[in-house]
Amino acid sequence: MPKRSIHAVTAAAALACLAAFGTTPISASSAAAQAAEPRPAAPRFVPGACPKPPEPIEALRKARCGFLEVPENRSRSGGRTIKLAVAVIPAAAEKPSEDPVVFMAGGPGADTFDDIPFLMDSGLNKDRELIVMAQRGNLYDRPNLSCPEVDRFNAQAVGLGYDSQRAEQLMLKAVKDCRGRLTAAGVDLSAYNTTENAADFADLRKALDIPRWNVYGYSYGSNLALTYLRLHPEGIRAVAIDSVTPPQVTTLPWGWGSAAEGIHNIFKACAAQPACKDRYPDLPRLLTEQVRELEAHPLTLNATPSSGGKPVKVVLDGGALLNLIVALTPRPKDIPAALDELSRGNPKRFARARAAGSVQNVGAFAHGLTNSIACGEWAPGHSESDVLKAGRKAFPGWPDTVLAQAPQLPFQYPACGIWNVPDRAKVQRVATVSSVPVLVVSGTFDVKTGASWAKGVARNLSRSTAVQVPGIGHWVVPQSPCAQRVLASFFARPTAPDTSCVNGLEPEPFTITPK
């Protein structure tokens, strides 16, 4: 992909790391303060300048931009107004289809506009307009629920044990400081949830006077798309979901099953390739050995971030190793080689990937939105012991210190005790049942949202088509030309997409290093 790495975007979707608004930078505190505006009589779209990210996005040069103005909390009369950044990108075709496609990004909390180049390269605007809206609280919105405090902690955390007491103390302080700053600015943290998110998109369609449109969402955006389809089905022509997080089952313990499934599929694919099987004959055993060894005897070393720059101190322990694999850093094709090198005393690949976390785009990721959704929708009804139980089931024999933390969401339960938002599990953990055509896309190497969950979602969607792409990880479409063709075919013929290109696909060869 030009300029932007797919790994950077997928890491953002999985909360690993992710600024300015308009023509001038706005601090997190001033952006939050801008929320205090009179509530409009009805949601409306107000034209305005397009965001100007540090790395220019070519598609925004021709886009029609502005803000969607909506109530911060629709359940409270007389509340405040928030502004959500919107871009309408014209279709490449001279005679485009009348029904546009609206995009729902992952995260929650990832910079939606940063995904635009991947959407363009995937042909999302080839035959129809592409509409992008930053979900409430994201970068370029007013307010922006970024947490620079958490970004700075993440940069520091690479030099700490993944599950160490010091890491927990510093993270919880960052969460507390962010919450205090946002609430002092008047932000209603309880209003940043999937129900309100879905209502925002329903209001956007009406505000733009669009009779019917198509929906495409990945990762958390698939959760949002399914919720939107359930609560606001009017005006939806077709829905495509990629790397599915089913609303009815997405909880903090759920992540362990997805991690185990994705890793199992990577190792199984290696075993199916003679050269890989011969060079790396027992990867499950090797991974378990390395997790145990690093958790008992963590490595502390200096490493250069994979993106370049000065070396930084990193601690590589069992928890860090597992979470680097979940983040698909290194790439799936390199994981067997990286594990083999690690077992032979060469941790360079994993150390550089760990060091990459020291380079944070401070203020770009809306950790406030992440916490409001994770704490209100994913954490309730379960406990830290449930996370540990799920971890033990997924990876028997691994150290409890590794398994006690949900993948990529360490210390989330104590963080939720600080964040203190209402329990929304009952209203959010509901299966979507619909006859609207739905395309369900998954990748067999997805270590964040297991591919098998797609089947359960599809069962409740009577006109659904499920496609599983071999050898692809999280967020399938930008990584697979075949998936791009399937998606285009689906939007052209939602009830009869051409999925034939998937037949015969195989994972690319794994990296084989000399013995």
PLM-predicted stretches and their roles:
Residues 183-187, 195-212:
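Conserved acidic catalytic loop of the alpha/beta-hydrolase fold
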Residues 2-13, 27-169, 206, 284-290, ...:
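Catalytic-loop region of hydrolases
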Residues 470-476:
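Histidine-bearing beta->alpha loop at or near hydrolase active sites
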Residues 447-452:
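Conserved alpha/beta-hydrolase "acid-adjacent" motif
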Residues 146-158, 225-290, 323-327, 333, ...:
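A catalytic-pocket lid/entrance helix-loop region that shapes and gates access to the active site
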Residues 288-436, 479, 513:
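Alpha/beta-hydrolase fold active-site neighborhood
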Residues 111, 199, 217-229:
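Glycine-rich nucleophile elbow surrounding the catalytic serine of serine-hydrolase chemistry
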